[in-house]
């Protein structure tokens, strides 16, 4: 897709089928029998196609991860019914004890489940393989494919060279396998300080791909691990762990984002070296890359998201303005809408920007058919029906959903004092304004229909000492009630919503906008903090119709004429509703 693109539509109006080059690869592999009749190391039959989702538990998942989750679990689900079957493994890549935490690990699993995916019995941790990874490292050492380097981290970095200069061999590169093995075991046994030695693969310091210049694969870290405790003081790095974990889990298609494209030769080198040494057998896994998700008005850098939280630009990881899964869930996006969004944007190898409106439209399309309707007055203005008896009330009703009559009706009363939206009245109406305005000269005030109620005519209005409008007065027409024969005698252009002041339920409503004013806050040399939107959250006191009194957290509604709202996951309670605006009825982002 082009910059800030949206899925295209066909002439018939249907959204075009998104591209997915990975399906073509898998189809080819299935047709060729590349992964047919596979068995694991124990000789047990396994599916032909195995994908995996392997996040590091060092932060909360975000919308970009959702794309990868939907891709990997979605491919497995789609191919599971074909010959040979398929599955997706869930793996936590927990090899860095310094940055990882149980809180993050639990949140990751909760996010994947919330999105609607199930890994069954196939939940793995990279830390499960620490013993095997160490064993394989020793095998590489014994076969002169790895060595212990005693240079400082700065010297290792300097001697790697750069794109225009080849690297320099470490003075320790020609240590014998026995020397390396002894040092590596002493590293394991805790005899050295952090950073005193590392284990490097012995590849080629003149390789044009800097990743292949004897990469570091083990380092000393005297830090307890959240799962293995103090058992280990050396830990494998991602590039070493990732491919071996894939091979141990019999992954067929290891799918990651484009930033790992330069790491693929290293992935292949490690797996193929261990295959040559008899550790693995064909077919070994292969890595494929796809373009990461770039969503307008959004950042997905873990470091920058952490900065937003720590510097209190937002109210935590689950702030509804955050692109984290916990944030967009609290905002009111549904699992179905996220999956629909990921399906629509497709998968490609070319970086592009996806317009935020694509995500919002996916939510509208999901909730249009299944969100109950409700009335909410967000910016209340009192409306007094002068010719209506204050001691009287008139029963009214409205469908819970216009296309689901089986859901029944909402019941409420028409009374003398009502709440309407302040925007539905203008003292001096502009051209094309068909809602309430007072008499002008010899012309009577405007007439509007109060939805599911009566037609009223504006007679006058009242203001406070500062000139602020505090009350609008109207007369109603008793024979104009909606649903009665007389209602057809009144032709009005304006149709507004209302709530009886006697029945209105007070509520806190939070109106969210983009967190950033720039559609590309993380691009170029700009400071993303300079683009923070100071008006990204507005908290207002609103009124809801009486049926909303006992809503539960995460109940979703379409507030008619406003948009889709959700009862806040944390703060809303029966009798004290708090709602978040998820998205408006129409795309209003500029």
Curated annotation (Swiss-Prot):
Gene Ontology molecular function, alphabetical: ATP binding; glutamine-tRNA ligase activity
GO terms under cellular component: cytosol
Pfam (any one): tRNA-synt_1c_C
Coarse class of the protein's main subcellular location: cytoplasm
Enzyme Commission code(s) on record: 6.1.1.18
GO biological process, one term: glutaminyl-tRNA aminoacylation
Short motif 'HIGH' region, span: 55-65
Ligand binding (ATP): 56-58, 62-68, 257, 292-293
CDD domains, per the entry: GlnRS_core (cd00807)
HAMAP family with a match to the protein in the record: Gln_tRNA_synth (MF_00126)
Name of this chain's protein: Glutamine--tRNA ligase
Gene behind the chain: glnS
